[in-house]
Amino acid sequence: MTQYWLGLDCGGSWLKAGLYDREGREAGVQRLPLCALSPQPGWAERDMAELWQCCMAVIRALLTHSGVSGEQIVGIGISAQGKGLFLLDKNDKPLGNAILSSDRRAMEIVRRWQEDGIPEKLYPLTRQTLWTGHPVSLLRWLKEHEPERYAQIGCVMMTHDYLRWCLTGVKGCEESNISESNLYNMSLGEYDPCLTDWLGIAEINHALPPVVGSAEICGEITAQTAALTGLKAGTPVVGGLFDVVSTALCAGIEDEFTLNAVMGTWAVTSGITRGLRDGEAHPYVYGRYVNDGEFIVHEASPTSSGNLEWFTAQWGEISFDEINQAVASLPKAGGDLFFLPFLYGSNAGLEMTSGFYGMQAIHTRAHLLQAIYEGVVFSHMTHLNRMRERFTDVHTLRVTGGPAHSDVWMQMLADVSGLRIELPQVEETGCFGAALAARVGTGVYHNFSEAQRDLRHPVRTLLPDMTAHQLYQKKYQRYQHLIAALQGFHARIKEHTL
């Protein structure tokens, strides 16, 4: 009987399930859309019961369409978005809707913390910046605005922790994710009560479940879950992965010469290093990586291809091929139309919002689409340039995410950055990485390093056009000037409203 490992991937828009054999060959993938709720401007929530129903449905669909039985599945892992907040009450029931990482309701709290110097106080211990989607920001918001709900908190989790609990009935917070929550002391490798004390949320210390490893077997499929999904009761479930870690793992990032760029709702640039550094040029975000003694370092903001998805939804459905043809039909770096990809947040200050600048009657939809492509790449450059100050010997950027399927967009990224672009040929990095964690956890591999060596994916390479690089550098500089001017505008508005 052929054995398989199941990988679940819960993102911002889709819940996916993939099956892989011992050699990593895909036996099937199923996807179901996820609904995000926005009961008020700037809020982003998810119905927790509905998410579990969707999870069960995608597992059932995968088993049905693949012809694989639950008896053949010998391990399960989950990859998911980081941050946000999934709460259980003291009776182990979902406590309201989950709050997603793109939620901005805690902006005033974060602004207040910034004025009080809290981020600078936290960073040496947590190696995290502090923003609206962090669990700690959302917990403080609940304490101030929904105190009755806050008082009922029995367990604090994030996305894949919640789904793992649904599957197994066992609570835990997976380390690659919880290490980036501002609840975790990076040097100590554990929760630190002084953090919640500084943040004014010490009441939730009792609600923090045990920290579990990515490949650690945390529980088994319950009889109830088995009856609802077709899985076999007793199948082991491992801790899983923060999706950024899963992507870096699948991209084969293992030294300081190559970085990984993830292009999705979030613009993320990641690198792998051994040890923490003090006195760096920027407050780089660190997280625990899957190998002992290693850390993932990244820069990120919600400023990537989600902006294109919003545009096409609002202004008429158009296929990805048609978009690429439209963008390719225009001269590279031509014109003075700019797009600021800040629909869901920015990397240029809390007040910054999205928009086109320089639009005239001569511009067509193709020009707007080109400006979106450029704006997303320019925003990625903000993070890439900062990361290259730390990873000084980088010569290659490995790119994953939806835009990696667009040669037009990837060539633009190569031309703007001047870097060699490599595209790992793996379709579902979240599912594959989660299943890989399950293979490590069930003993197929001794560790993730051994698994990476055994499962190298082919890559496709694009090289920069250095003539276009010079043109894009000039336009990127103008983009930076526009950002600076708008930052000045917001600063003056703030002065007049005080």
From Swiss-Prot:
Assigned keywords, A-Z: ATP-binding, Carbohydrate metabolism, Kinase, Nucleotide-binding, Transferase
EC number: 2.7.1.-, 2.7.1.53
GO molecular function terms attached to this record: ATP binding; L-xylulokinase activity; phosphotransferase activity, alcohol group as acceptor; protein homodimerization activity
One GO BP: L-lyxose metabolic process
pH relationship of activity: Optimum pH is 8.4 with L-xylulose as substrate.
CDD domains from the UniProt entry: ASKHA_NBD_FGGY_EcLyxK-like
Pfam name, any one: FGGY_C
Catalysis: reaction(s): L-xylulose + ATP = L-xylulose 5-phosphate + ADP + H(+); 3-dehydro-L-gulonate + ATP = 3-dehydro-L-gulonate 6-phosphate + ADP + H(+)
Quaternary structure and interacting proteins, as annotated: Homodimer.
Family listed: Belongs to the FGGY kinase family.
Function text: Catalyzes the phosphorylation of L-xylulose and 3-keto-L-gulonate. Is involved in L-lyxose utilization via xylulose, and may also be involved in the utilization of 2,3-diketo-L-gulonate.
Protein name, per record: L-xylulose/3-keto-L-gulonate kinase
Upper taxonomic lineage: Bacteria, Pseudomonadati, Pseudomonadota, Gammaproteobacteria, Enterobacterales
